[in-house]
From Swiss-Prot:
The gene is POX2. It comes from Yarrowia lipolytica (strain CLIB 122 / E 150) (Yeast). This is Acyl-coenzyme A oxidase 2. PANTHER family: ACYL-COENZYME A OXIDASE-LIKE PROTEIN (PTHR10909:SF352), ELECTRON TRANSPORT OXIDOREDUCTASE (PTHR10909). GO terms for cellular component: peroxisome. Its cofactor is FAD.
Amino acid sequence: MNPNNTGTIEINGKEYNTFTEPPVAMAQERAKTSFPVREMTYFLDGGEKNTLKNEQIMEEIERDPLFNNDNYYDLNKEQIRELTMERVAKLSLFVRDQPEDDIKKRFALIGIADMGTYTRLGVHYGLFFGAVRGTGTAEQFGHWISKGAGDLRKFYGCFSMTELGHGSNLAGLETTAIYDEETDEFIINTPHIAATKWWIGGAAHTATHTVVFARLIVKGKDYGVKTFVVQLRNINDHSLKVGISIGDIGKKMGRDGIDNGWIQFTNVRIPRQNLLMKYTKVDREGNVTQPPLAQLTYGSLITGRVSMASDSHQVGKRFITIALRYACIRRQFSTTPGQPETKIIDYPYHQRRLLPLLAYVYALKMTADEVGALFSRTMLKMDDLKPDDKAGLNEVVSDVKELFSVSAGLKAFSTWACADVIDKTRQACGGHGYSGYNGFGQAYADWVVQCTWEGDNNILTLSAGRALIQSAVALRKGEPVGNAVSYLKRYKDLANAKLNGRSLTDPKVLVEAWEVAAGNIINRATDQYEKLIGEGLNADQAFEVLSQQRFQAAKVHTRRHLIAAFFSRIDTEAGEAIKQPLLNLALLFALWSIEEDSGLFLREGFLEPKDIDTVTELVNKYCTTVREEVIGYTDAFNLSDYFINAPIGCYDGDAYRHYFQKVNEQNPARDPRPPYYASTLKPFLFREEEDDDICELDEE
C-alpha cells in the first residue's frame, strides 16, 4: 500500500481513509485470520448448540431496557444497588421457566457484563441454595423449595459463614447452636462481637433466610461447625425476626451492587430439622451422627471455587479482547522516517506484554471445563448417595478430597491470573485504560475480592500444597491417589529426567518438564515432612514449617495442570482447521511459563542455560505467529460490544469515535463554569492581593 495514499474505502456504509483510520486497520487485521473463527467459538463453547444458546441469551439481555449499560460507570452505590435488585427480580423469572443449564448460561453471561448482579444472584443460588442442596437431605431440600427458595418467591437466601474475627479458619468460627432437648430446638447465639457474621452478601437489604455456619453443641459437647437454616426477616413486611440484628457494612472497594451486611443472633430458636442433616444428624433424644469426612459438610464451598475458575476465563477474555483490539488500531511513533506510525501490536515488546495473557485466558478455559466436569460428577454421586452405601461413601469421600485440593489451587491461581490480566491490559492501553468508560478500573475493583472470599488465595494455596504432600505420603505407603496427582507414581522415572536434545515444541516434553519440576518439589517437601515427624513434630507443626514448600508445590503443580489440560483438550477435541492455531497458543503458554520460572528448571536440572536461550527464542517466535491472528482469537470469544462495554475495544475498531461519543454523552456540555464557580473558584481567582502575597526578589 502506498503510504501517501489518501483515498477512501467504505466499511459498513461509512467512508474511511484507506490507511490512517482505525476501522480500516481493524478490517485488515480481521482478514488475516487463517482459521474458521466460528469453529473456534464452537470449540470454546463446547459445541454449536451451546454457542447458539449463548447468542440467543446475549441478544435477550442486550435488548432488555433494564440491562442498558450506557450510564453504568457513572452510577453511585445506591443507584447500583437498586438497579441490581431490579435485574435480579427480572432474572428470577427465567429461573421458573427455563432448564437449569440455560439458567447457568444466562448467569455466566451476566457475570461478564455486571458482576454485582451475578454475585447477588450467586449468593442465593450458588451459596444458600448450594448449601441446602449439598448438605441437606432430599426432604429438607424439597421443604425449602416449597417455601419459595427455588424461584425467589417470598424467599431470598444468603450465606452466613464469615465472622468479624474468623474467615479462613472455618473450624474456628464461634457462633453457637445449642440443642435444647426440652423444646426440640437449636438456640443460635453470637457470643461476642468478634463472632458477628460479617461480609454477608444479601444480608443488609434482601435476605429473608440464611444458612448459618455455627458450632453444634449437644449435651455440652462441641461437635464442630455445621450448617443451619435460620429465618432472618418476617415474610409479610420484611421486618427482622426476634433476636436478629442486621446492619449494612457500607462502602467497599467494589461490587456495590451487593448489599453486604453483618448479622448477630441473640437466643434465636429454630426447629431441630433446620440443621442440614445429609451428613451430620441429631435425633430427638440428642444423639449425634457425624460424617466420615468433615469436608462433606462443606461441599457448598467447592461450588464457588469451581465457578471462580470459569469466571476467571469469562472476565479475562473480555479484557484481553479490549487490549488486543486497541493494540491493532492504535499507532504510536514510526520506526522508519517519513512512514506512517506503527501499530503498537507490531512492537515485539507489546506482543510479549499481551499475547502470553491471551494464551493464559485460553488455558484457563480448558482447565475450568475439566474441573467443572469433575465437580458435576462428584455432586451427582453425593446427591445419589444412600445412607447405608459404605462403598459409595468411600468413593465420594475420595472424590471430594481430590476436588477440594484441585479446586483450591485452581481457584487461587486462576483468580490471581485474571486480576493480573485486568491490570496488565489496562496498562497496555495507556492513558485510555485509566478512563472509567473503558471498564478496567471498575472491573479490577469488582474482581479482586475473588482473591479473598470463599477462601483466601494464600490459605487455599497452602491447603493445596498440604494435600500434595499427603498424596505423596500415601503413594509411599502403597495407597491410591487421585488422577490429578497420578504423575507422581512415575516420580522415580522423572526425578532425574533432562531435556537431552529433545524438542521444546513437543507437548509431551513440555508437560514432562512441569511434571519433573512439580514432582521434585513435592517429593523433597515430603522428605522434609517425614523427617520433621520423625523429630517429634505433629502434622500441623510440620506443615507449618514447610509453608514455603507447600506454596511452591501448589504453584508448580497447578501450572502443570493448566498446561496438560490445554494440550489434552486440543488432542481430543480440536478439529483439524483449528488444531494448529490452538497449538500455537498452548506452546506459547507452556514456553512462556517456563521462561517466567526459568530458575526452577535450571535448579531441577531439566534444562541447561543454553536451553533457556532456546525457550526465549521460541516465545518470540510464537508471539510473532499468534500476533497475526489476534483478532480471530479474540473474535472467537464471541462477545458483542454490549458485553465488552469499552469504546476502545469495539468490534468495528472505530475506537476514537466511539470513545469521544461516550464521554460526551455521559458528560454533556453545559455552562462552562463548574457548579462551584461562585462559591469557590471565583473567590479564589479574584481574591484581593495582600502584602504577604507579594514575593520580593532580592536584587544583586
